[in-house]
Design a protein with these regions (language model features):
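Extended catalytic cores of very large enzyme megasubunits
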Residues: 1-788
Length: 788
């Protein structure tokens, strides 16, 4: 146990006027540290020890020797990093983080708490006296105009999309984000667009009328220049060889959502696993890169498949918490990869002399998703397609799977149908779906694709061998995680969208459709894929798919009219034909879809895709870390916040911010989440399917307890047009600090009057290093994914 301080709290701390032996010794490894303002100063061990000693005196815990012991532990960790990583440069904030860590590890709880509170107060003091540069103020003021009355949107934008500018030690503003996207667009297209067209596209994005791929919005610049995969939203693949698992990992690490098939038709193509022969390959040193992690997985799988074994050396992998400079986020350290390799080894060796089962392939891929979430990507999105008669996959989330197989939570599961099921077959699946409580498995109807796809794509599928003589699509054709884009195995979905507003007219929607199609057509030219196999390039070039979506449909009465939907669809198709010719590429085989738009809807204040808003007036709550500089700035400017449920106001590690929101459409035609029955939701989905999408409208149907039988009857009657559908039990459960809470008009107006006018330019005074989390956005986020 820690010692109790044996001196008065008022003891005067003195420091030596000369440099100590410890400082001289440690400077051989760590000559300098970086201050908050970017200045480099000589490393000083005594300053660290003295700071810890002052904290111990204040909390009456420990003595000078204890303080020096903790300081040696802190600096010892820095020394290990300095040996492992060339040009390692500690920062003041990083050193203070280590001090907190080792105070806690040594059980100096009171000292650690006092030290954390002291740091927070000092940060507030620095922020209150910090000057925001005039040009930053001006940029922030100009950008704020585009978020007029949308404090939630500006917050989500800064949190999810604003990149760090190292030279100015701050996050970019909305105008700078749009210009970074436009600069990358010019870099790739050159004079294939006129200045007038570039201006039209830029203005449409700035005014939040249309959006490109939000992945490309995040990563335009160095990251997308290095590998275009990070600019795409989602993918689909049906693994048939060990390398395919590594490609899934690579794409997930790039931030792409991954749809995958574990049907018998592809899993049975994986090789037979040889029995272990006792041979062990030399230890493999894992390179500290996405490619290095993926190579390690491929090597492990191939080795275990061949009856041999191998060990891995993780010493090159950067420590947990290190910044990921190109993609953003923080490194996880080696533990997630170590866990994945151990899991994959166990699964492969358990099947010696046989092949992997479909559930084994599913679990390994889910474990990849879990590894990637831990390894720097904020969230991953996956969908697993399986055979209708695969009982193990049907029951994959039965009971308390989150206790025994928690990795399975990262993927939604859907059953594949190639013909219309009998009543008995569908009811078996339906009962399992109802009992699961999580709406699984969903439906992926491969058998309807030949009827619902555009003729040009049906012809392409015939030539590619996907369409049988009976007119049914077969083979590895699937979908992205939210089911709005129909994909071949090893193909990307390419999204852009129209944001429909309450005041839109037919003319304004058609102009937005034109701009969104230009964006999608441009994005389809980005095929520098790097690590993954050439099949991905071949499939993308052959089809040049677009996914022009309409979000905010329940904000805009005009956008919900069938004849307007058809005109918007036709405008997008015609625009794609014209600009594909100009860009020297093929026309897209399919153009229109509806994506859920979870994060986009929060950022740009619109209803999510095909779904209505929560209520006419509601509170939107957002979780955020207590250590996040963005939270501290919001708190200090008076934004309402509460500790997470079960945590105290003083000791919380997560806080909940509250934003009042008003829906724009309060006409008689307006509908909200609880206004639509399951059948009404399905009928509206059908309207969009038949009048707008060449792919599929993504939706999750909320079903009341007494609606399940009526819903399954509707599904049977409309089987020929169903592509992909998901269902969830409608929940009326109310719990504290829920993401959404309906309120009255009076409460909304009262909350709005009290809500501060947040000056986001002040973030520069709080954020001394890159804290942006660029891997948060998943364009296919829907349902529970909207809980940000």
């Amino acid at each position: 146990m820690p010692k109790t301080a044996n001196v008065s709290v008022r003891t005067k701390i003195t420091s030596a006027s000369t440099v100590s032996k410890e400082t001289i010794r440690y400077r051989e490894m760590i000559p300098q540290i970086e201050k908050r303002d970017g200045r480099l100063v000589p490393f000083d061990f005594d300053k660290i020890a003295t700071a810890i000693w002052k904290a111990m005196v204040a909390s009456e815990e420990g003595d000078r020797e204890d303080a020096e012991l903790v300081a040696h532990q802190v600096v010892g960790e820095l020394g290990r990093f300095a040996k492992k990583y060339k040009n390692f440069l500690p920062t003041v904030e990083g050193i203070q983080d280590s001090v907190e860590k080792y105070l806690i590890l040594n059980d100096y709880v009171k000292t650690a708490k006092g030290y954390i509170l002291y740091r927070d107060k000092r940060a507030q003091l620095r922020a209150s006296h910090a000057d925001v540069p005039d040009h930053v103020k001006k940029l922030a003021e100009e950008s704020r105009k585009y978020f007029d009355g949308n404090a939630l949107g500006e917050f989500v934008y800064l949190r999810s999309y604003a990149r760090w500018i190292p030279e100015e030690r701050r996050r970019e503003t909305w105008i700078e984000t749009v210009d970074r996207y436009m600069n990358f667009m010019r870099e790739n297209l050159g004079d294939k667009l006129t200045e007038k067209e570039y201006t039209e596209v830029r203005t449409g994005i700035l005014r939040q009328e249309v959006m490109p791929s939000m992945r490309l919005m995040q990563f335009s610049g160095d990251a997308a220049r290095r590998c275009n995969t990070c600019g795409y939203n989602c993918t689909f693949t049906a693994p048939v060889k060990p390398e395919d698992f590594a490609e899934i990992m690579y794409l997930s690490m790039q931030g792409c959502g991954v749809g995958f098939a574990v049907e018998s038709q592809n899993v049975e193509q994986l090789p037979q696993i040889m029995k272990q022969n006792g041979k062990k390959l030399p230890t493999h040193v894992v390179d500290d890169s996405k490619e290095g992690w993926c190579d390690a997985l491929t090597l492990g799988l191939k080795t275990w498949y061949s009856g041999k074994d191998i060990a891995f050396d993780f010493s090159k992998i950067r420590p947990a918490g290190a910044r990921l400079k190109v993609m953003g986020g923080k490194a996880s350290g080696p533990e997630p990869l170590r866990s994945l390799l151990a899991f994959a080894r166990e699964r492969v060796l358990s099947r010696q002399g046989r092949r992997l089962r479909t559930i084994d392939a599913h679990d390994i891929i889910c474990k990849i998703g879990e590894c990637v979430v831990s390894g720097g990507v904020r969230r991953t999105a996956m969908i697993s397609l399986s055979d209708l008669d695969d009982v193990e996959m049907r029951d994959a989330k039965k009971g308390q799977f989150y206790m025994t197989d928690p990795h399975r939570s990262v993927a939604n599961n859907s059953a594949v149908y190639e013909t219309q099921p009998t009543n008995a077959e569908l009811m078996d699946e339906w009962v399992a779906l109802m009992k699961s409580g999580c709406g699984e498995r969903g439906i992926f109807n491969r058998g309807s694709l030949a009827v619902t796809m555009p003729k040009r794509r049906v012809e392409y599928f015939k030539k590619a061998g996907f369409l049988g003589d009976d007119g049914v699509v077969r083979g590895s054709i699937g979908a992205n995680p939210c089911g709005e884009i129909i994909l071949q195995s090893k193909q990307f979905c390419n999204l852009s969208e129209v944001i429909a507003r309450a005041n839109d007219t037919e003319a304004s929607l058609l102009e937005k459709a034109r701009l969104a199609a230009i964006l999608g057509t441009y994005q389809s030219t980005l095929t520098k894929f790097g690590y993954i196999s050439k099949d991905w390039l071949d499939h993308c070039v052959a089809e040049r798919l677009l996914g022009v979506s309409i979000t905010g449909q329940w904000d805009s009465p005009v956008a919900r009219q069938p004849e307007i939907m058809r005109k918007v669809r036709d405008t997008a198709i015609k625009t794609n034909i014209a600009y594909a010719k100009r860009f020297g590429i093929k026309q897209a085989m399919s153009v229109t879809a509806v994506k859920p738009s979870g994060t986009v809807s929060q950022t740009f204040n619109c209803a999510s895709g095909i779904h209505p808003r929560h209520a006419p007036y509601y509170i939107r709550r957002v979780r955020i870390s207590a250590t996040d500089s963005l939270f501290k700035m919001m708190r200090d400017q008076g934004v309402p916040y509460y500790p997470e449920v079960g945590q105290s106001l003083e000791g919380a590690n997560t806080y909940v911010l509250e934003f009042p929101v008003k829906a724009p459409d309060h006409s008689k035609e307006a509908r909200f989440k609880d206004d639509l029955s399951a059948i009404e939701q399905l009928e509206y989905w059908k309207r969009v399917k038949l009048n707008f999408t060449e792919h599929n409208p993504s939706t999750t149907i909320s079903v009341d307890e007494d609606e399940w039988i009526g819903v399954v009857d509707w599904v049977q009657k409309n089987w020929d047009i169903i592509g992909g559908l998901s269902f969830l039990p409608r929940s009326s459960h109310v719990y504290r600090l829920a993401p959404y809470e309906a309120i009255t008009k009076e409460e909304y107006e009262e909350r709005l009057a009290r809500f501060p006018k947040v000056d986001y330019s002040k973030l520069i005074a709080y954020e001394r290093q890159d804290e942006s989390d660029m891997k948060r956005e998943l364009a296919c986020a829907s349902g529970t994914c909207e809980v940000v």
